[in-house]
A protein has these predicted regions:
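Short acidic/His/Gly/Ser-rich catalytic and metal-binding motifs that mark active-site loops
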Residues: 58-59, 102-104
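Structural recognition of alpha->loop->beta junctions
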Residues: 41-54, 118, 124-133
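Short low-complexity, flexible loop/linker segments enriched in glycine and/or proline
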Residues: 41-44, 108-110, 148-157
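Aromatic-acidic/polar surface patches that form glycan- and anion
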Residues: 6, 115, 119
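Short, surface-exposed loop/helix-turn segments at secondary-structure junctions
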Residues: 64-68, 106-115
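Active-site neighborhood of glycoside hydrolase catalytic domains
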Residues: 1-94
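Aromatic- and carboxylate-lined catalytic core of secreted/periplasmic carbohydrate-active enzymes
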Residues: 88-92, 99-103, 119-205
Length: 205
């Protein structure tokens, strides 16, 4: 969903929810390679920001031929930096990075699949940049795939079922990132990219 389109609808939805429930965190899940912070950070109903670094690799275009709207591509730490530079300051989370086992680009089963090393990279990139947490996803778990049942996003009915995908390495390695985050008090963690020695690498470097 684009945050800068049909804004009157999002405003009406948010305000209607607030009218009956003021006790839950509210945010906005945006379209791929975009962030709620860009257009909605100043909204009073927006408690925290979300962005979607998405499922495309560097330079990969959407089906309609458009390139990345922001130019940030899959560098999800850049979305974190951008959101944390805004006023008022709000927590930010990558709500949809690349999912383990999903085709790069999302829909073409002939494309390479995102692996455990990729989902780890997104997790540590965003958390070390200052995000309030991280989202993990798996293609087979997301669809609750079961044997013999074709699914979407490259699933052809012969892939492992969702309950076996729960043994995949990326799924099981996310606990290390979680444990690292919980080691330190939440409100004492302060984003500080200046602690990085040397210059930032490029893409996978």
């Amino acid at each position: 969903t684009y945050a800068d389109r049909n804004t009157e609808i999002w405003e009406a939805l948010a305000n209607s929810i607030l009218a009956v429930d003021e006790n839950h965190i509210m945010t906005f899940h945006p379209f791929g390679r975009t962030s709620s912070a860009t257009h909605l950070n100043n909204k009073e109903w927006m408690d925290m920001n979300m962005f979607q670094s998405g499922h495309r690799r560097y330079g990969q275009k959407k089906g309609d031929g458009d390139t990345s709207v922001t130019g940030l591509e899959e560098d999800n730490w850049r979305y974190v930096e951008e959101a944390l530079s805004m006023t008022p300051l709000k927590p930010v989370l990558d709500a949809e990075p690349s999912y383990e086992g999903i085709p790069q680009g999302l829909h073409d089963p002939a494309q390479p699949r995102w692996r455990d090393c990729d989902v780890r990279r997104y997790g540590y990139w965003s958390v070390f940049a200052g995000s309030c947490g991280h989202t993990y996803g798996h293609n087979n778990i997301m669809q609750f795939l079961k044997p013999g049942t074709p699914g979407g996003y490259g699933a052809d009915g012969i892939e492992k079922p969702w309950y076996k995908a729960m043994q995949d390495p990326g799924f099981n390695q996310m606990k290390y990132l979680k444990n690292l985050m919980l080691t330190f008090p939440y409100f004492e963690r302060v984003p500080d990219q200046s602690v990085i020695a040397g210059t930032n690498g490029n893409r996978y470097d």
